[in-house]
Regions:
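Conserved ABC ATPase "signature" region
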Residues: 22-30, 121, 125, 132-150
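Conserved ABC transporter NBD signature motif
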Residues: 80-91, 95-96
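Conserved catalytic motifs of ABC-family nucleotide-binding domains
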Residues: 175
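Catalytic Walker B motif of ABC-type/P-loop ATPase nucleotide-binding domains
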Residues: 179-182
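Helical segment within the ABC ATPase nucleotide-binding domain
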Residues: 194-207
Length: 216
């Protein structure tokens, strides 16, 4: 079976300003800009098969989020090779994002002042989903994520756990085959973390979605 995600010797380096301390350092910073390379991701290789659910573990600063952003096409690697579902993520972005879903724990794709369901409707319009297909998928996600009582609430009024369930549903409205989850349980209490993980396992088992999830 051909891997749906192929990563070989992936690298991402960032050029960061080197700050010198003290009064002398302040003058040096003012007149001489020095930089250093930070190796955020350095030589990672792995494959994922269709339908796998894989946890990507590591401490803060290990490069987990940077890796997910490269897989999602938000960052271009410094070196190495990367293919997702036969595509290069940062090329032909419009076509690529229609095939994947992504959730970043500290960011939202929904609109803070709009009710949840209106945010879903806007995303359906952006993805140009067939109305009947969208309604079936929405009904499925609402039942799976237990969103019935949340649909008419503005996003800003939701708890963190409620918002995360809505974010995962939003990422799946266009029925992607691949889902990237970057710290989806960050800041959640233990009970809510377990609930989110159960939802992800159910999605993987019943919908066949390939999932890559980062966590500590």
């Amino acid at each position: 079976m051909t891997a749906i995600i192929q990563v070989e010797n992936l690298q991402k380096f960032f050029k960061v300003f080197k700050h010198h301390r003290g009064l002398g350092g302040a003058f040096r910073n003012l007149f001489s800009r020095e930089y250093q390379l930070v190796h955020a991701v350095d030589g990672i290789s792995f494959d994922l098969q269709p339908g796998e659910l894989v946890g990507y573990l590591g401490p803060n600063g290990a490069g987990k989020s940077t890796t997910i952003k490269m897989l999602a096409g938000l960052l271009v690697p410094t070196g190495g090779r990367l293919s997702v579902n036969g595509q290069i993520p940062w090329q032909d972005r419009t076509k690529y994002v229609s095939k994947i879903g992504a959730v970043f724990g500290q960011r939202t794709t929904l609109w803070w002042d709009l009710p949840v369901v209106e945010g879903f409707d806007l995303l359906a319009a952006i993805y140009r989903l067939d109305p009947a297909d969208y309604r079936r998928t929405l009904d499925r996600m609402v039942g799976l994520m237990r969103l019935e009582r949340l649909l008419d609430q503005p996003v800003r009024q939701l708890s963190l756990g409620q918002r995360m369930r809505c974010e995962i549903a939003a990422a799946l409205l266009h029925r992607p085959r691949i889902l990237f989850l970057d710290e989806p349980t960050i800041g959640l209490d233990a009970t809510t973390k377990l609930a989110v993980r159960d939802i992800v396992r159910t999605l993987n088992r019943e919908e066949g979605v390939t999932v890559l999830l980062t966590t500590h």
